[in-house]
Amino acid sequence: MSATSSWYFPNGSLSAPNQPLALDVKRAGWTYCGIDVYSFSAKNKEIEIDLGNREAVVVPLSSMSATIKHHDKKYELAGRPGVFAAVADWFYAPAGSKFSLAAESGEVAVCTAIATKEFAPHHGLASSVPVEPRGAGFATRQVNNIATPDSFAAADRIIICEVLTPGGNWSSWPPHRHDGIAGCPNMNEEIYYFRIGKQNSDHGDAEGRGYFHAYTVDKKVDDTITLNDGDVYILPAGYHGPSIAAPEYPMYFLNVLAGPAQDRTMAFCDDPSHHWIRDAWKTQKQDPRVPMTSASGRVNNS
């Protein structure tokens, strides 16, 4: 089955000059979340960003470094050659910020959420990002908890994490939702920004393939997507999972979440048909390929 909803955006369908990805709330057709990915080169080394009523988390994807000038302070972010190469530094910019973002080359993500409260800017070090092996067996994956409620409290609505899945494994499993309907009290919009690698690649590869399933409670949306590197899927509602990494094609996705709750939360409701899987993990070992990366680079688990 192919995509039947308007929630799937193939790579390039949301591009702009020097922006492989430009997704705001208007284009998404919802209230809170957005993401921009900027591409830097000799002809485009610096951009100016005005957040207005949004807060943001800046994450280098394939830039070795990025410089942020926020008011009278300069922040030097340690980057990486690609999302499969290492964990990177990150930066939180509060609502109302105007700042410049500069890099010599590569891509940098600016994740946003509508905000009503203002917090202080923050430079997060890669070495301080909690790296969590999650799941077990063929559902073992790595979660980099960049700006989650537990890892970073000083934000209004935005929640950011990265998930890396070894080739042949599943993530987003069991299927779960956080749409505030049909008995699930938790409400967050969510963006999935996918990069599909190739064996031993630092970043995404055009040959990479993966798979993703999403469906609503009423089954009016039931999408099974063949993913290419750089694709986006947005989730205003419904169950999502699994995200499947094909053998030898590791999968990365950057999640951006935000919702109306006064207190940020990552709570969700499993599909009751598959909740039992969490108990099955108790008797399974985690895949030794996880974690795949750290602040220092690739993790050698051989």
Identify the role of each PLM range:
Residues G106-T148, P247, L254-S302:
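Double-stranded beta-helix
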Residues L14-E48, R141-I191:
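A short glycine-rich, His/Asp/Glu-containing loop-to-beta-strand
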Residues F212-W276:
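Accessory, usually C-terminal, subdomains that scaffold auxiliary metal cofactors
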Residues I47-Y75, G167-G168, D179-V232, S243:
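Glycine- and acidic-residue-biased ligand/ion/polar-headgroup-sensing regions
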Residues S2-E48, E55-S65, R278, Q284-N300:
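Hydrophobic, proline/glycine-rich low-complexity stretches
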Residues A95, A103, V110-A115, A147-D150, ...:
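Short, structured patches in soluble enzyme cores that scaffold and shape functional sites
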Residues C33-A102:
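Extended, compositionally biased flexible segments
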Residues F84-E104, A113, T226-P247:
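Conserved metal-binding segment of the jelly-roll/cupin
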